[in-house]
Design a protein with these regions (language model features):
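Polar/charged alpha-helical tracts
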Residues: 83-86, 90-94, 126, 153-157, ...
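Basic helix-extension-helix modules of the SAP/HeH family
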Residues: 105-160
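Long, largely alpha-helical accessory region at the distal end of helicase-like NTP-driven motors
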Residues: 1-107, 114-119
Length: 163
């Protein structure tokens, strides 16, 4: 119709009243369970059936890393813990279905399989509270440890060279 709608200008700034920020606990809201691999909160890993993601702390920075079936381990992000955890969680949700997340959560109440126990170190086999999911996370880390270290150390070196 060709009518020109005029935007009313105002000198008032759009100030917010009663604004409150709330921290969201991504670990609790995730479709996957995040395992603290070594009990020091510096290495967390979640696993599905086809993919896994982890966040690892090195020299003051967090690194988000992911793996998918037979694809190479990849760097997902570098930065603060919450940001890396969000990146890793998002990536894992993109790779896995909701059904896989729910099936893997069932493993939180099941004992490790004999096959899992065979590959775990003696101290993990002696942990009678260990679940099938925790065993899966530990084994995922064990089988991908060198690739994870390579990706994290390369990213750390790049950061140091840029600084």
């Amino acid at each position: 119709c060709g009518h020109s709608f005029k935007q009313e200008e105002s000198d008032e700034k759009g100030a917010l009243d009663n604004f409150v920020m709330t921290e969201i606990d991504l670990l609790k809201r995730s479709n996957f369970s995040w395992c603290d691999l070594f009990g020091d909160d510096c290495a967390l890993l979640a696993a599905g059936f086809k993919a896994w993601a982890g966040v690892f702390f090195l020299e003051g920075r967090w690194y988000a890393v992911g793996g998918f079936e037979r694809s190479p381990v990849r760097l997902l992000g570098v930065g603060e813990r919450t940001v890396c955890l969000a990146q890793a969680n998002d990536w894992l949700n993109e790779q896995e279905s909701d059904d896989a997340a729910h099936k893997s959560r069932r493993w939180l109440n099941e004992l490790p399989t004999p096959g899992q126990l065979r590959y775990l170190p003696p101290e993990a086999r002696a942990d009678f509270g260990l679940t099938r999911y925790q065993a899966s996370a530990l084994l995922t880390f064990k089988f991908n440890k060198h690739a994870i270290q390579r990706v994290v150390h390369a990213a750390n070196q790049s950061y140091l060279e840029a600084a």
